């Protein structure tokens, strides 16, 4: 008999919402994100983006940027080559590439661009930076990130957090972010869903005490 990994009757995420997903290992967070991206097909039910079934059309791919893990990257390219490749997919001009590099200059911290190093040789933290930056290419309306703070040093975590907040303020992006870091996720997201064994246990919205509520839920 198969095991039910996800059992969510209905979950609606609104436009411009900053949505956080938290839960312990094995809760189903990554499975949910992979299902939304049509990388895993549900045995029942469906995922719709802007009212359209993700299995039935590819339109959503033009306005959703995502980074779940390093499998999204191309290991035999350098970061420079990879960004140029993704840039071409979005018809980036030289000026677009220049402004992209400028936006992420602080996060890259002179460790990513122009180093003649293959993506496969990067540290876990720098892989994360490349993936997050690439997710923003093409100015997507929706950005999905799985554990964006994992493997980053404290300075880089703060830079990622500030980047996410600034981009949302400027462009009204819809975020879907899963994280084990309760502090960062509560600073970025005004709505947080707790997932446990594939089910939504709590759906917290706009509470001043969200961090305290999460800590209370997860305490041993």
Each language-model region and where it sits:
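A short, flexible loop at the N-terminus of ABC-type nucleotide-binding domains that lies
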Residues: 1-8, 15
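Catalytic Walker B motif of ABC-type/P-loop ATPase nucleotide-binding domains
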Residues: 143-147
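Conserved ABC transporter NBD signature motif
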Residues: 45-60
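Helix-to-loop junction immediately C-terminal to a conserved catalytic motif
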Residues: 37
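The feature captures the beta-strand-to-loop junction immediately N-terminal to the Walker
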Residues: 22-24
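H-loop/switch region of ABC-family ATPase nucleotide-binding domains
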Residues: 178-180
């Amino acid at each position: 008999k198969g095991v039910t990994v996800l059992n969510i009757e209905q979950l609606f995420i609104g436009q411009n919402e900053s949505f956080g997903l938290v839960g312990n290992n094995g809760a189903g967070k990554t499975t949910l994100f992979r299902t939304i991206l049509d990388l895993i097909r549900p045995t029942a039910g469906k995922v719709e983006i802007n009212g359209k079934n993700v299995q039935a059309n590819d339109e959503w791919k033009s306005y959703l940027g995502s980074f779940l893990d390093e499998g999204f990257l191309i290991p035999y390219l350098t970061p420079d080559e990879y960004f140029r490749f993704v840039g071409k997919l979005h018809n980036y001009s030289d000026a677009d590439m220049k402004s992209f590099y400028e936006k992420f200059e602080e996060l890259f911290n002179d460790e990513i661009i122009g180093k003649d190093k293959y993506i496969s040789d990067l540290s876990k933290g720098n892989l994360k930076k490349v993936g997050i930056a690439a997710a923003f290419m093409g100015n997507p309306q929706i950005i999905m990130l799985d554990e964006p703070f994992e493997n980053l040093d404290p300075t880089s975590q703060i830079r990622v957090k500030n980047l996410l907040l600034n981009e949302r303020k400027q462009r009204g992006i819809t975020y879907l972010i899963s994280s084990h870091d309760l502090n960062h996720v509560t600073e970025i997201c005004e709505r947080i869903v707790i997932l446990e064994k594939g089910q939504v246990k709590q759906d917290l919205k706009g509470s001043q005490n969200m961090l305290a509520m999460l800590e209370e839920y997860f305490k041993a």
